Amino acid sequence: MKALYFNGKSLEYLEDYEKPVRGEDEALIKILYAGICNTDREIMKGYRPDFKGVLGHEFVGEVIESNDKALLGRIVVGEINRGCGHCKYCLRGEENHCINRKVLGINGHDGVFTQFITWRNDLLHVVEDNLDPKKALFTEPLAAAIEICEREDIKPTSRVLLIGDGRLSFMIGQVIALTGADLTVLGKHQNKLDNFKSFANVIMDTDETFEIVIDATGSPSGIETALKLVENRGTIIVKSTYTENIEIDLSEIVVRELSIKGSRCGPFKPALNLLKKGYVEFPDVEFFELKDYEKAFSSKSFKVGFKLWED
């Protein structure tokens, strides 16, 4: 089968990659669409130096084989973290933080830039008929945006600064706006900031400070900006992963009594509900064939992905 294999240094397009065989608790999934995430780019820069295999974790697919008859033939999306089921995190329902977890296309398991994958049945979510499968490709990153509201109690009275004007920020911004909070977006590109104007205040510079600051820049400089613009006793939520190491003055954190929270993967059901009900809107995905991966990774479109099969 076709696949994009990361050899530890670069991507290789293969047409003879071995098709996986499912386990008893797994489904064999025909990948219809796969989305490119910034994490994929970071892995290619060295974020996960131990990973070699098929990249990609955002997908929409069709269940071809499964012992769960309710899944057979259904269009699905899938959570990306697969826990061991035995550690303290798994036993208290925090599989995303399992110390032995496998992560699609990131750690210990081939990803979705290929034509077929196997994945555990209970990690799959059915895409209802009234949701376009191409729109469902936003489920995983949208769930990650929703997780911010799980990590921090954002109220209608909260004053929130979102740093970054890229794809992830656009998703986060729409989610935060639904809380009724006073949202301001700080970015560097006026043409991108224009997309936020319907639900947020937009700025390119400020000395004002905010109760909650979210860094979704994907750049180490975002943390520096967040520290300057968060109120004393405020909260910084970090939404990006970085290849580089970042230095932070811990004395400043202590003296100003700041809270810094990481936020990663999130709940799929609310994400599917928001997409299905049209509460969030995103531009269409630009799709490429796997063999054109270089064009895909260099595209400037809002969302880029792979279409794995011809119509």
Residue ranges: model-predicted function:
Residues P220-L274, L308-D311:
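Glycine-rich phosphate-binding loop and adjacent beta-alpha segment
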Residues F210-A216, K303:
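Short SAM/SAH-binding signature in class I
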Residues G73, L131-D207:
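Mid-domain Rossmann-like dinucleotide-binding core that forms the NAD(H)/NADP(H) cofactor-binding site
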Residues E18-A34, Y47-K88, E128-L131:
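Glycine-rich beta-strand-centered segment in the early N-terminal region that forms part
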Residues K269-D311:
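C-terminal hydrophobic helical "lid"/dimerization subdomain
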Residues C84-I163:
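NAD(P)H dinucleotide-binding glycine-rich loop of Rossmann-like/cofactor-binding domains
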Residues V77, I214, I237:
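N-terminal Rossmann-like NAD(P) cofactor-binding module of classical short-chain dehydrogenase/reductase
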